[in-house]
Amino acid sequence: MFAGSKTVSSERNDYIMKATGIVRRIDDLGRVVIPKEIRRTMRIREGTPLEIYTSVDGEVIFRKYSPVGEISGTADQYADVLYKVGGMPTVICDRDHVIAASGIQKKEVLERRVSSSLEDLIEQRKSLYRTADGIKMNPIEGVDRFAVACAPIMADGDVNGAVIMLSDKENSAVDDKTKALVEAAAMYFGKQMEDV
């Protein structure tokens, strides 16, 4: 997979694999070492689940597996409910990308990468609740909105993503209702992933 340059088309996406010139051998236990440059670029950390499948051309393909992505239909609906009840734009993300949004232009945020500051926050399993004079955190790369409330989605002891309510022009601080909504949503998605 990593050694050749090939255009692959599927019904969902068209993408081009770049030639990296890296060839790896499988050891006697069936392990393959993924080079550090690729792990860094693709944000593959120790413990990151990878989906392995083969193509008809004889390729072995590794793809990052997102448990949050498995429940994206529910995530869309839940984001809509959170927006209607909480009155603030809402996004739900896995550890890398936004997978659901409501109250904000979906084209603006869907599939965008999460910021390194959000990555660090959810990696530490911390929640964020902004006060009127609190620190501003931009959770999505390239989007000029700040997190008002953020809670990590945890399932089976692993952090899988986050539920985030974003600031808009009228709302800059979080109240108890918003905290409860975000925490309940994060717990709900954690339970959903444990049951899948």
Residue ranges and their predicted role:
Residues M1-I16:
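N-terminal amphipathic/basic-hydrophobic helices that include classical n-h-c signal peptides
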Residues A19-T20, K84-G87, R145-A147:
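Short, small/polar residue-rich loop motifs at catalytic or cofactor-binding pockets
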Residues V23-A100:
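Intrinsically disordered, low-complexity terminal regulatory regions
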Residues S72, D76-V81, V114-E119, A162-V196:
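Juxtadomain coupling helices with adjacent low-complexity linkers
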Residues A79-G142:
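Structured interaction and signal-relay segments at domain junctions
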Residues A101, G161-A162:
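Short glycine-/small-residue motifs
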Residues A147-M154:
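A short, aliphatic-rich beta-strand micro-motif
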